[in-house]
Design a protein with these regions (language model features):
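Helix-loop-helix junctions that connect adjacent transmembrane helices in secondary transporters/permeases
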Residues: 139-222, 388-465, 694-705, 710-716
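Thiamine diphosphate
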Residues: 241-263, 267-269, 479-487
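C-terminal catalytic domains of large/alpha subunits in multi-subunit enzymes
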Residues: 60, 70-71, 224-230, 259-268, ...
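Short Gly/Pro-enriched turn/cap motifs at secondary-structure boundaries
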Residues: 11, 90-92, 181-184, 279-282, ...
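Glycine-rich loop/linker segments at domain edges
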Residues: 9, 15-18, 147-191, 284-368, ...
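Short acidic, glycine/serine/threonine-rich loops at helix termini
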Residues: 77-81, 113-116, 205-206, 214-216, ...
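Short, aliphatic-rich beta-strand segments
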Residues: 38, 201-205, 465-470, 648-650
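Flexible, low-hydrophobicity surface segments
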Residues: 1-152, 171
Length: 773
């Protein structure tokens, strides 16, 4: 294996010191001269006609600079299918609906003004259950649609499921259900909007999609009558995303409108309670599944149908069925597949991208049912998975082209570390059980848009310091650190010589955004390409460079390394001759020569990497990603039969990552994702009653805390993907995908009880124990 100096090293995150010392500036820390503060009035009803809005009292309050409703401003619409106006008129469809907004000299005055706005409503019947919402006589959320079923036909068919079911030796079928959970980023959302005298807009926003937000805000300016105005987005330090910042929201456009009306910068940030109430969630789903296998335990078919709660409007959450198709069609070798999903409008909150993007929901059903099918066939669950595991070179029913794949190795690692065979065959300890589940996720980008690309500009100064302008966004996952290591490796410099600039759309290249675990693969490849061009430029210069100096006696000397740049290397801030390693010249000296010599040149280069993956066609088939990430998680649990509490004794997480660019950050991703997955499985639930969030705080929303940290054992399996930067694949999302089914399977092994609804709280476990008795 090649010897590497930066790649594969356990280098701390670049922003770690700034964060722990309080130097990092988040959106909450930013203040612009003359800034006003915005607040938003939202609906008191989940479904109602708006009869009247009276803002007169709010406008009279000292310190208020503007009050706006839908009647006062252009009607900007947003969302995946643009079904949502920024400020509502006519009627409201959820408690999240924005009716009016205030800009004032301080947040307290703005809050007081909001309470002075009077709204008269005419309540309408609400519908909060997707099954009820599909009935012919259900209240319509959007009357113009004539139905509450979203007109996006999520359907995938490959092979003949009906015939395969008839010929299967064993069939297992069941129903599973998952509910709302939310992102719980430590950094809540916020934005500052500021116009100059030419109506150009500058935005400070903690977003995952600066380039796409730039496009959306540009469209908003067109609606406002300024098609030629410019948009600039500056990102502060971002305290987590997990998909929550993968779209533009109403509050952003409201900040823009208030800034335009007042001609002052306007800042809107969310409180923690507002974050719980008004941030989009993971999409709830009701899932029916059937799978079959032959006598040898080889899968014959998989058949799944789903009903998903779309909420009152359509955000990116409505597209999660496109990712649910991935494990349904391509987790294990399954020749015949059928999948259909319906997204249904209700008066509940609407959903958004969230880490895993539909994959955790689908995998919970698939891997719980795989356990049932293994039991029906009489085959050990681990062996059953090995018999059906994906392999390199495979083309799945959805036409995914599997390149690197170490799923079998991951399953075997879980079995070995949990001592699977002995625990399954030996005497059982009461209340204890082991379980496992596998995963597939995109690991080489995902062509959701027309482009899946990312740009990079690399520039070197006189002294060998490297500036990398990347389109990628660091939202806490360590993208800056990884890109720095890749560039350092490619150029032969030290990681500390590399500076990453990723905060400003005026200077940074275009990128489609932080989603689909794509940053290491796509932005990494882009950075490597640009760095390689710069390295080649430097070596070309070095080949023609003559080093001249005088010794202490005043004698002149000169040296040339080699006429052929292929015989030169950069290492530790020096350029060396490969043939004569004792011959070396300081990198900075060569670079200064390029700038000061006659006919000098700039040492910089750009690259744009767009993987040759495919958009899914009308049948939802195509090679969505350039590479696929695989993994398997194994869990040992202990269940208290008196309380129903599930204690995780061991948690093994084996991941095929291609190559670990930074094992320490990679392990951190696995730790964090597994903790999020365990929360999804056991504790987390956003409780809605008739559309209203009932637990909008960390006291009542049971997020795992430091005292609940599980004993995760990360296992890194390197399959070396030929298309990845130095062999790497994405890892950001996969680590939470199989947690819930692995735990559910372990609980079944411990108690003989199959839990089919998340979260598997002590109350639900205890109820199941009592029902079994």
């Amino acid at each position: 294996m090649e010897t590497l100096s930066s790649v594969g090293k356990r280098i701390p995150k670049r922003d770690a010191v700034d964060k722990v010392t309080g130097r990092a500036a988040y959106i909450q820390d930013l203040k612009v001269p003359g800034m006003l503060y915005g607040k938003i009035l939202r609906s008191k009803y989940p479904h109602a006609r708006i009869v009247r809005i009276d803002t007169s009292k709010a406008k009279k309050l000292l310190g208020v600079r503007a009050v706006i409703t839908a009647e006062d401003v252009p009607q900007i619409r947003y969302g995946f299918i643009k079904d949502q106006p920024v400020l509502k008129s006519g009627k409201v469809r959820s408690y999240r609906d924005e009716l009016a907004a205030v800009a004032a000299t301080d947040p307290e005055i703005a809050e007081e003004a909001i309470h002075l706005i009077e709204v008269e409503y005419e309540a309408l019947p609400g519908v909060f259950d997707p099954m009820e919402a599909m009935k012919p006589d259900a209240p319509l959320i959007h009357e113009e649609n004539k139905s509450n079923i979203l007109k996006i036909p999520w359907k995938l068919v490959a092979g003949d499921v009906q015939e395969a079911r008839k010929t299967s030796a064993f069939v297992a079928e069941d129903e599973f259900e998952v509910t709302w959970v939310t992102h719980c980023c430590l950094g809540t959302e916020g934005m500052i909007a500021d116009f100059d005298l030419r109506n150009n807009l500058t935005v400070h926003r903690n977003t995952q999609i600066p380039s796409l937000a730039h496009r959306d805000f540009k469209d908003a300016l067109k609606v406002m009558g300024f098609p030629d105005a410019k948009v600039r987005i500056i990102k502060p330090t971002i305290g987590g995303g997990f998909g929550s910042k993968l779209d533009t929201y109403g509050f952003e456009y409201i900040a823009i409108l208030l800034a335009f009306v007042t001609r002052k910068p306007v800042k809107i940030t969310r409180t923690r309670e507002e974050e719980f109430r008004y941030t989009s969630t993971r999409q709830p789903a009701m899932m029916k599944i059937a799978q079959g296998c032959d006598k040898e335990g080889k899968l014959t078919f998989r058949d799944i149908s789903m009903i998903l709660d779309n909420g009152a409007y359509t955000s990116w959450g409505a597209t999660t069925p496109s990712v649910m198709m991935m494990p349904i069609s391509s987790l294990y070798k399954v020749p015949n597949v059928r999948y259909e999903a319906k997204c249904v409008y209700t008066n509940n909150t609407w959903s958004q991208a969230m880490r895993g993007y539909g994959n955790p929901q689908a995998t919970f059903a698939i891997e719980s049912n795989m356990e049932q099918l293994a039991q029906a066939s009489g085959i050990d669950p681990l062996e059953f998975r090995l018999r059906n595991a994906n392999e390199p070179g495979e083309v799945t029913p959805q036409r995914f082209k599997v390149t690197s794949c170490a799923l079998k190795e991951c399953i075997e690692e879980v079995g070995k570390r949990l001592d699977w065979g002995s625990k399954k065959k030996g005497p059982k300890v009461e209340g204890r059980g082991i379980g496992m589940a596998s995963l597939i996720h995109v690991g080489g980008g995902a062509r959701v848009y027309k482009s899946d690309g990312c740009g990079t500009i690399v520039k070197v100064d006189d002294f060998g310091n490297v500036d990398v302008f990347t389109g990628a966004t660091d939202i806490g996952q360590g993208a800056d650190t990884i890109i720095g290591q890749l560039v350092a490796e490619e150029m032969g410099v030290l990681p500390e010589d590399v500076n990453i600039i990723d905060r400003d759309t005026d200077v940074c290249p275009w990128d489609v955004g932080v989603h689909a675990s794509r940053t290491t693969f796509v932005a990494g490849n882009s950075a490597v390409m640009a760095a390689r061009k710069v390295r080649e430029k430097i070596l070309d210069l070095a080949a023609g460079f003559v080093d001249r100096w005088k010794d202490k006696q005043g004698n002149k000397h000169e040296m040339k390394l080699d006429d052929d740049p292929k015989n030169l290397v950069i290492k530790d801030r020096m350029v060396y001759s490969v043939k004569e390693p004792e011959k070396k010249i300081a990198l900075g000296k060569i670079l200064r020569g390029a700038h000061y010599e006659k006919n000098g040149t700039m040492i910089m280069a750009e690259a744009f990497y767009d993987p040759d993956n495919e958009n899914l066609d009308k049948e939802f088939k195509g090679n969505l990603s350039k590479a696929y990430a695989y993994g398997a998680h194994g869990v040992e649990v202990e269940v208290d039969k008196e309380t129903g509490k599930v204690k995780i004794l061991r948690y093994v997480a084996a991941h095929d990552v291609g190559r670990a660019i930074n094992p320490m950050l990679l392990e951190g991703q696995i730790y964090g994702a597994a903790a999020m997955g365990v929360g999804y499985a056991l504790t987390e639930r956003l409780i809605l009653e008739k559309g209203e969030v009932m637990n909008p705080n960390f006291r009542d929303y049971k997020l795992l805390t430091a005292k609940d940290v599980i004993p995760v054992e990360p296992v890194i399996v390197e399959s070396m993907d030929e298309a990845g930067p130095y062999g790497a694949k994405g890892i950001g999302e996969p680590g939470l995908v199989p947690s819930a089914p692995a735990i559910a399977n372990a609980i079944y092994d411990a108690l003989g009880i199959r839990l089919k609804k998340l979260p598997m709280t002590p109350e639900r476990v205890l109820k199941a124990i009592k029902e079994k008795k």
